Amino acid sequence: MATASLVPTSKIFSVSPKSSASIKARSRVVVASSQQQQQPRRRELLLKSAVAIPAILQLKEAPISAAREVEVGSYLPLSPSDPSFVLFKAKPSDTPALRAGNVQPYQFVLPPNWKQLRIANILSGNYCQPKCAEPWIEVKFENEKQGKVQVVASPLIRLTNKPNATIEDLGEPEKVIASLGPFVTGNSYDSDELLKTSIEKIGDQTYYKYVLETPFALTGSHNLAKATAKGSTVVLFVVSATEKQWQSSQKTLEAILDSFQL
């Protein structure tokens, strides 16, 4: 009959003092090696984080600066002629057309509690400068209680083949607004909507001024406009309001229109 002997497990799994020391030494080497490998990785991650943080901050700030979603009184100077308004003077950094030299710098006053609106890239002319075939929007400002204003620019060649034509070269005020009317209303233009026209001279520059009642316009039931031509561009300044806005802010809106000039 076969017999089985039991061998103490402590002897099988026992580790000699020399082996134990060797294992500990190897463990220290492995740990040290792992730490050395991790250190460059940590440094790399820290460097990436240092670069990424300012970028994230810029992304958070960009929408505010791009849309200027603050009241214009917080960053525009007071108008010298009337301190109840602030003065907006367009600079080359403001629009693609100004940077390209297609539009001469312009200016107008605004109440200090108005805000600048963001303009979609496709409407800003950014994609077609310096030679745009279609009109584009330069800048736009708004106050929900008073109304909105926008500067629209159109290539002169849409209205005449004469280089450097003046606004007078384009015809009488009624003829010019017939071409530019849809850019005032946002949809269509009917000559019956035109209430009044006038001609203004500021220095060497002539402006056509319009008062329109536009019940079906997308921009509002009341529109004021001022048009002039210089270089290769016709510039149209539009002041729009709903019936409620017009009733409370007519004089303010008229003052804004009168202030516009190249």
UniProtKB/Swiss-Prot annotation:
UniProt keywords, alphabetically? Chloroplast, Disulfide bond, Plastid, Thylakoid, Transit peptide
Q: Cystine bridges: which residues?
A: C128-C132
One BP annotation, GO: photosynthesis
Q: Which GO terms describe its molecular function?
A: calcium ion binding
UniProt-listed InterPro entries: Mog1/PsbP_a/b/a-sand (IPR016123), PsbP_C (IPR002683)
Q: Which Gene3D superfamilies match?
A: Mog1/PsbP, alpha/beta/alpha sandwich
The job of this chain, per UniProt, is described as: May be involved in the redox regulation of photosystem II.
Q: What is this protein called?
A: PsbP domain-containing protein 6, chloroplastic
Species classification: Eukaryota, Viridiplantae, Streptophyta, Embryophyta, Tracheophyta
Q: Give the gene name.
A: PPD6
